[in-house]
Regions:
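Catalytic beta/alpha-barrel core
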Residues: 105-106, 176-178
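Acidic/histidine-rich catalytic cores of soluble enzymes
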Residues: 141, 163-177
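Active-site beta->alpha loop and helix N-cap motifs at the rims of alpha/beta catalytic domains
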Residues: 1-161
Length: 178
């Protein structure tokens, strides 16, 4: 018997067929989001395979739209993780998605939520990542109601203050945010 949390077995044919079905309806696909961010059994290596296979399939579908999650889920949050570690982790995933020809959805980072000491750390990380991407990205920010490990994201437990920090980053990099 397989443990789906430890022994991931993806039915690639059905997975890609479902993406093709979504594209046939005129819908876009946000790829490798739940799997990469929420720990649903697919690690970063598996997420890369999913992104690659979906991008390959997308190229055969006129008008298909897809963006792929890039985050830091391969970096385990911990007391020794620094903001620089988070930057390197984001860069690794962003570079991988771009190297495959994909568009990026920049996911919130549990490691950043733990390593950051205030809004300035978020500004530092997002400035660096947004300055390095080739094409505009979608910034994806889940609140703590979806992931308690993201409490205080953007350097504040007050959502209005957090949004001000996020909006300042977006404004500073308007050409890099979709």
């Amino acid at each position: 018997e397989q443990d789906p949390w430890l022994d991931v077995a993806v039915d690639w044919d059905r997975t890609i067929a479902y993406r093709r079905y979504l594209w046939s309806l005129g819908l876009g696909v946000a790829e490798a989001m739940d799997t990469a961010q929420r720990g649903m059994g697919l690690d970063w290596t598996g997420a890369q395979e999913l992104i690659r296979r979906s991008l390959d399939a997308m190229r055969d579908v006129p008008g298909a739209v897809m963006a792929s999650g890039a985050g830091t889920d391969h970096l385990a949050p911990g007391p020794d993780v620094t903001v620089d570690d988070v930057i390197r982790a984001y860069e690794e995933q962003c570079e991988a998605v771009e190297a495959m020809g994909g568009r990026i959805i920049l996911m919130a980072s549990r490691a950043l939520a733990r390593a950051a000491r205030g809004p300035e750390d978020y500004v530092c990380v997002y400035d660096r990542i947004l300055s390095g991407v080739r094409e505009p990205v979608i910034i994806h920010w889940l609140g703590e109601m979806f992931d308690p490990a993201l409490e205080g994201y953007w350097g504040s437990g007050d959502h209005t203050q957090a949004m001000e920090t996020a909006l300042a980053v977006i404004h500073a990099h308007a050409d890099k945010v979709d």
